[in-house]
Amino acid sequence: MARCRRHSRSRSRSRNQCQRRRRRHYNRRRTYRRSRRHSRRRRVRRRGCSCRRCSRRRRRRC
Protein backbone atom coordinates (compact mmCIF):
# COMPACT_ATOMS: atom_id res chain seq x y z
CA MET A 1 0.00 0.00 0.00
CA ALA A 2 2.85 2.40 0.79
CA ARG A 3 4.39 1.75 -2.62
CA CYS A 4 1.10 2.55 -4.38
CA ARG A 5 0.74 5.84 -2.54
CA ARG A 6 4.31 6.87 -3.32
CA HIS A 7 3.80 6.09 -7.01
CA SER A 8 0.68 8.26 -7.27
CA ARG A 9 2.48 11.15 -5.55
CA SER A 10 5.42 11.05 -7.98
CA ARG A 11 3.01 10.90 -10.91
CA SER A 12 1.22 14.10 -9.88
CA ARG A 13 4.54 15.86 -9.27
CA SER A 14 5.80 15.02 -12.77
CA ARG A 15 2.56 16.32 -14.28
CA ASN A 16 2.97 19.64 -12.46
CA GLN A 17 6.55 19.99 -13.66
CA CYS A 18 5.43 19.46 -17.24
CA GLN A 19 2.84 22.23 -16.97
CA ARG A 20 5.39 24.61 -15.45
CA ARG A 21 7.90 23.86 -18.18
CA ARG A 22 5.30 24.45 -20.92
CA ARG A 23 4.23 27.77 -19.37
CA ARG A 24 7.84 28.97 -19.06
CA HIS A 25 8.53 28.11 -22.71
CA TYR A 26 5.43 30.03 -23.87
CA ASN A 27 6.45 33.12 -21.90
CA ARG A 28 9.97 33.00 -23.29
CA ARG A 29 8.67 32.83 -26.88
CA ARG A 30 6.34 35.77 -26.26
CA THR A 31 9.06 38.02 -24.83
CA TYR A 32 11.46 37.13 -27.68
CA ARG A 33 8.88 38.12 -30.29
CA ARG A 34 8.18 41.41 -28.52
CA SER A 35 11.88 42.31 -28.14
CA ARG A 36 12.48 41.61 -31.84
CA ARG A 37 9.81 44.13 -32.86
CA HIS A 38 11.24 46.80 -30.60
CA SER A 39 14.77 46.33 -31.94
CA ARG A 40 13.47 46.69 -35.52
CA ARG A 41 11.79 50.00 -34.69
CA ARG A 42 14.92 51.35 -33.03
CA ARG A 43 17.01 50.57 -36.10
CA VAL A 44 14.67 52.60 -38.32
CA ARG A 45 14.95 55.57 -35.97
CA ARG A 46 18.74 55.39 -35.85
CA ARG A 47 19.04 55.61 -39.64
CA GLY A 48 17.65 59.15 -39.64
CA CYS A 49 14.63 60.82 -41.15
CA SER A 50 11.16 59.27 -41.10
CA CYS A 51 9.19 61.78 -43.20
CA ARG A 52 6.91 60.74 -46.09
CA ARG A 53 9.25 61.84 -48.88
CA CYS A 54 12.18 59.84 -47.49
CA SER A 55 10.05 56.78 -46.76
CA ARG A 56 8.70 56.76 -50.34
CA ARG A 57 12.18 56.97 -51.86
CA ARG A 58 13.48 54.49 -49.29
CA ARG A 59 16.09 57.04 -48.28
CA ARG A 60 16.38 58.02 -44.62
CA ARG A 61 17.92 61.47 -45.13
CA CYS A 62 15.92 64.60 -45.70
Curated annotation (Swiss-Prot):
Q: Which tissues is this protein detected in according to the database?
A: Testis.
- GO MF annotations for this entry? DNA binding
Please state where this protein is localized. Nucleus; Chromosome
GO-annotated cellular components: nucleosome; nucleus
Keywords of the record, alphabetical order, are:
Chromosome, Developmental protein, Differentiation, DNA condensation, DNA-binding, Nucleosome core, Nucleus, Spermatogenesis
Chain residue ranges for the region called Disordered: 1-46
Entry's family note: Belongs to the protamine P1 family.
Supply the name of the protein.
Sperm protamine P1
Species name: Planigale gilesi
Q: Which gene encodes it?
A: PRM1
